[in-house]
Amino acid sequence: MTEKKYIVALDQGTTSSRAVVMNHDANIISVSQREFEQIYPKPGWVEHDPMEIWATQSSTLVEVLAKADISSDQIAAIGITNQRETTIVWEKETGKPIYNAIVWQCRRTAEICEHLKRDGLEDYIRSNTGLVIDPYFSGTKVKWILDHVEGSRERARRGELLFGTVDTWLIWKMTQGRVHVTDYTNASRTMLFNIHTLDWDDKMLEVLDIPREMLPEVRRSSEVYGQTNIGGKGGTRIPISGIAGDQQAALFGQLCVKEGMAKNTYGTGCFMLMNTGEKAVKSENGLLTTIACGPTGEVNYALEGAVFMAGASIQWLRDEMKLINDAYDSEYFATKVQNTNGVYVVPAFTGLGAPYWDPYARGAIFGLTRGVNANHIIRATLESIAYQTRDVLEAMQADSGIRLHALRVDGGAVANNFLMQFQSDILGTRVERPEVREVTALGAAYLAGLAVGFWQNLDELQEKAVIEREFRPGIETTERNYRYAGWKKAVKRAMAWEEHDE
């Protein structure tokens, strides 16, 4: 029998599908990536073609093995991590979607959300699902599809249609329609799942008129869900044994499995999650209560804060403002000046996320004087990412009563040393950057590997988690608080900018 030397993580993201092969030392052997089309039918609407998600993801799996010259019988297991909340409804019989995938960023269900608020459901939804009422989550997207595709609700009642987030869709395709499952982390992002009883919430299903028959079975994040054949019939059968939504996978990949440990992912937006152990902490400060993975993939809880504009604000400097040619240049120009010369950039281009949740805020630059140049604005834009992270951390510490001692970081922007140092300065906390940057894929690989005994336990993984660089605060508390007070003043003035009917 061939030795099982590798784990494959499938990382299905918002703009691309990736496959990553890792060995027993958690080193990356090979990566394959394919982008796919973003569909914008109307302003504020975002869709993907589910068949293209499947085509790109399945081809990266074949490609990554070929690239590394690994045969499929050397693979111990496959783990899946995915863009969360994105919603797919398909026919059970044919496996064909009845509508495009409605993506997490899509705002088309804003009106449905307003109705839920008017019906006084905010408190119920926050208490039972851990979420705020927002188009971001899957529930209203499923309702929208059932409302707009003729006859679909009746078909769903008859058991002819299935709903799934992206993880569920991929497993359904990989097992030729034999397995219809999701995991607790993905279920906790639907606004249909009761995070205390760990079951679909009957009241939410009734309110949104979603038939229970179409929902997947919900399982732990680390167990064998089914097998997939690589190389068609008669090919190698490989267990699929790990699932987690991308941010929860990153939390696990950073080994934040103890209460009070937190990570921040700096991507297009920022996502900070703090593990709160076995207790679900209800946020009084605009954060989400969500499900995370415990040491063996069991249910833990986490607080989550999402910042909409992080890396995206650097892209704005490059693409719209033409102040830089490449995102990497931002660090160079930011360090050409001593400070921002009193300037604050509030990148509320699509409103503000946690802890403000103000869809009517808009981007602004404050504190302009005659001496301000492009470098000051570039520096202030980078600093805004760190300030927004502090906003979320303050809310987390207030909710949980836990004082953070170190923040683990990952994502594209962590390569920026200026930003990481400023982050440490403004938080007054150590910032730890890991050696392996692919922590989302790492989390999915860990969950899959633990389920099949490829790794025995977390202690074995702890040895592999190397911190590449630690940033420590380099400014005084008075200076830190003075700068942060300026940020708070700027945010206040950017809020409620856009007119809206009360």
Curated annotation (Swiss-Prot):
ATP binds at T14, T15, S16, T268, G311, Q315, G412. Sn-glycerol 3-phosphate binds at T14, R84, E85, Y136, D246. Pathway: Polyol metabolism; glycerol degradation via glycerol kinase pathway; sn-glycerol 3-phosphate from glycerol: step 1/1. One of its GO terms (molecular function) is metal ion binding. Activity of this regulatory enzyme is affected by several metabolites. Allosterically and non-competitively inhibited by fructose 1,6-bisphosphate (FBP) and unphosphorylated phosphocarrier protein EIIA-Glc (III-Glc), an integral component of the bacterial phosphotransferase (PTS) system. One of its GO terms (biological process) is glycerol-3-phosphate metabolic process. It catalyses: glycerol + ATP = sn-glycerol 3-phosphate + ADP + H(+). Pfam families: FGGY_C, FGGY_N. Keywords: Allosteric enzyme, ATP-binding, Glycerol metabolism, Kinase, Metal-binding, Nucleotide-binding, Transferase, Zinc. The keyword Kinase applies. The keyword ATP-binding applies. Glycerol binds at R84, E85, Y136, D246, Q247. ADP binds at T14, R18, T268, G311, G412, N416. One of its GO terms (cellular component) is cytosol. Its EC number is 2.7.1.30. Belongs to the FGGY kinase family. Key enzyme in the regulation of glycerol uptake and metabolism. Catalyzes the phosphorylation of glycerol to yield sn-glycerol 3-phosphate. NCBIfam families: glycerol_kin (TIGR01311), PRK00047.1 (NF000756). Homotetramer and homodimer (in equilibrium). Heterodimer with EIIA-Glc. Binds 1 zinc ion per glycerol kinase EIIA-Glc dimer. The zinc ion is important for dimerization. This is Glycerol kinase. It comes from Shigella dysenteriae serotype 1 (strain Sd197). The lineage of its organism: Bacteria, Pseudomonadati, Pseudomonadota, Gammaproteobacteria, Enterobacterales.
